């Protein structure tokens, strides 16, 4: 009887560990070739073709002209107006606003695909679905970034790198290393596309807070906050000091916040026009169904925490576009790409076949062991 009792206790203990403490598995191999090919096609459609046929958006044309003009004279933010981050204008300066910037965009999209695949594979363990998600990312880029939104495309690899670290923690809560790198990657993304990065960082923070509250990981939450803040500061202050040194710090802050400071509800003559255009375009992309699934669909805690925050990110991004006084342009909807991708990621069903088969094998071994004991007794 003692023998049977010990075996039963071990069986119950192992069953509990399978459900409560996920075992970290080896990730699926990254499909580098397909990501390289898809990112090249997305770059050609969104950047090369608009350059060739003169279809670059007015805002993007102004940014590229600024890169050329900086070679002639003047300082960024002081002599030239710009709402994007400092590193974006540095690249525009280096390439003189030419089509050569497409090479950097290609590298950025390739990196974004790699890190998004890792994040999806870690969170849900579905290699095929992770590949589909990366493909959908490039479809969104090719469609929404046709002739504009290049600053956000450059920020995507840093945004998705931080996402890959966060999803690793959500999937394996005991492994919460790397949050200093989360802050550093978000700082780099901020110096390309400030406002979308701030929204994405808020979404990740809300997702982690919700997950930690549900699991009671308060100490983890404090560590993650301070580690991320440290990582952000390590890059933000050295890079931001350039604007202090050139005397353009105040102008940089005011111009970066210009899209937010000029939002208006009652004195906006373009309000109805913006609402109809951006909402219909977002609905056509499937945002309504994704929002409903993100808010109300039942899913594991690690996915539900992110889906709620991502839904808020989509709504806030659309709200900024609707309340904006800027002229209507479809490329401005590129800001919702990271949040749509997050909603798609959290809507993937987790692969439990591996864990189930592992538990079945363990039960089969224990059953055969019991049979052997019964024979000898």
PLM regions: where:
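Perimembrane helix-loop-helix junctions
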Residues: 199-233
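Short acidic/glycine- and proline-prone juxtamembrane loop motifs at membrane-interface regions
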Residues: 145-155
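Short hydrophobic alpha-helices at membrane interfaces in multi-pass membrane enzymes
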Residues: 166-188, 218-222, 226, 308-312
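Hydrophobic/aromatic-rich transmembrane helices and adjacent perimembrane loops
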Residues: 322-357
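Transmembrane-helix motifs of polytopic, lipid-linked glycan transferases
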Residues: 102-125, 161, 165, 292
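Membrane-interface alpha helices of multi-pass inner-membrane proteins
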Residues: 178-194, 200-205, 316-322
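Membrane-interface transmembrane helices that cradle and orient dolichyl/undecaprenyl
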Residues: 160-181, 290-301, 348
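Transmembrane-helix signature of polytopic, membrane-embedded enzymes
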Residues: 113-143
């Amino acid at each position: 009887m003692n023998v049977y009792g010990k075996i039963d206790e071990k069986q119950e203990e192992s069953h509990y560990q399978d459900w409560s403490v996920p075992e970290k598995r080896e990730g699926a191999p990254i499909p580098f070739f397909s990501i390289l090919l898809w990112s090249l096609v997305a770059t050609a459609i969104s950047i090369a073709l608009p350059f060739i046929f003169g279809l670059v958006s007015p805002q993007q044309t102004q940014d590229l002209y600024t890169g050329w003009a900086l070679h002639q004279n003047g300082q960024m933010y002081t002599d030239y107006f710009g709402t994007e981050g400092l590193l974006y204008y540095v690249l525009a300066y280096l390439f003189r606003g030419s089509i050569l910037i497409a090479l950097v965009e290609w590298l950025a999209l390739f990196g974004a695909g790699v890190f998004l695949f890792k994040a999806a594979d870690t969170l849900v363990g579905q290699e095929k679905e992770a590949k589909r998600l990366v493909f959908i990312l490039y479809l969104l880029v090719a469609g929404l970034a046709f002739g504009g939104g290049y600053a956000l495309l450059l920020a995507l690899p840093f945004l998705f790198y931080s996402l890959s670290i966060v999803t690793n923690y959500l999937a394996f809560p005991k492994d919460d290393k790397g949050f200093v790198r989360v802050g550093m990657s978000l700082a780099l993304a901020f110096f390309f596309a400030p406002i979308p990065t701030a929204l994405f960082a808020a979404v990740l923070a809300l997702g982690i807070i919700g997950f930690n509250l549900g699991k009671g990981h308060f100490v983890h939450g404090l560590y993650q906050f301070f580690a991320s803040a440290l990582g952000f500061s390590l890059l933000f202050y050295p890079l931001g000091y350039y604007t202090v040194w050139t005397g353009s710090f105040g102008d940089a802050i005011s111009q970066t916040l210009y899209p937010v400071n000029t939002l208006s509800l009652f004195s906006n003559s373009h309000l109805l026009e913006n609402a109809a255009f951006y909402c219909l375009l977002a609905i056509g992309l499937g945002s309504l169904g994704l929002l409903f699934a993100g808010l109300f669909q039942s899913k594991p805690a690690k996915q539900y925490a992110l889906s709620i925050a991502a839904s808020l990110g989509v709504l806030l991004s659309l709200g900024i576009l609707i309340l904006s006084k800027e002229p209507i342009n479809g490329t401005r909807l590129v800001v919702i790409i990271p949040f749509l991708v997050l909603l798609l990621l959290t809507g993937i069903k987790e692969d439990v076949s591996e864990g189930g088969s592992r538990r079945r094998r363990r039960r089969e071994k224990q059953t055969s062991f019991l049979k052997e004991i019964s024979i000898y007794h």
